[in-house]
């Protein structure tokens, strides 16, 4: 009697697991994460031959600001560069190796520039 209950609980637990979103790992390619419908996402190429994550963040920030200047309501966007997620918003750019994981400050706003967190003037 206990075995079927344990088996049923295990099946329910496995059914609730969903694969986590993985960022593309292509070298030198900057991506924007687009959401088509609830639960449907894909990565759009923003730029190729991007030398580093800072340049990708700058490209994504430029795209974010252009969207806002055209009347867009979403102040936060997500991108990816070489297997890392980039989360951009009014506070700056945060990075993580997983979509749902801890996000670490990467670049912050200082005036109209993005700078490393320790370089920003108070």
Residue ranges and their predicted role:
Residues 1-18:
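Sec-dependent bacterial lipoprotein signal peptides
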Residues 18-122:
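Mitochondrial intermembrane space
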């Amino acid at each position: 009697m206990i075995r079927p209950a344990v088996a049923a609980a295990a099946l329910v637990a496995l059914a609730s697991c969903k694969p986590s979103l993985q960022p593309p790992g292509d070298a030198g390619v900057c991506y924007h994460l687009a959401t088509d419908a609830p639960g449907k996402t894909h990565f759009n190429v923003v730029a190729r031959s991007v030398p580093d994550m800072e340049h990708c963040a700058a490209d994504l920030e430029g795209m974010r600001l252009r969207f806002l200047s055209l009347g867009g309501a979403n102040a936060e966007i997500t991108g990816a560069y070489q297997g890392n997620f980039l989360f951009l918003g009014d506070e700056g750019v945060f990075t993580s190796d997983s979509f749902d994981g801890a996000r670490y400050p990467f670049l912050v706003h200082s005036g109209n520039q993005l700078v490393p967190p320790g370089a920003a003037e108070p």
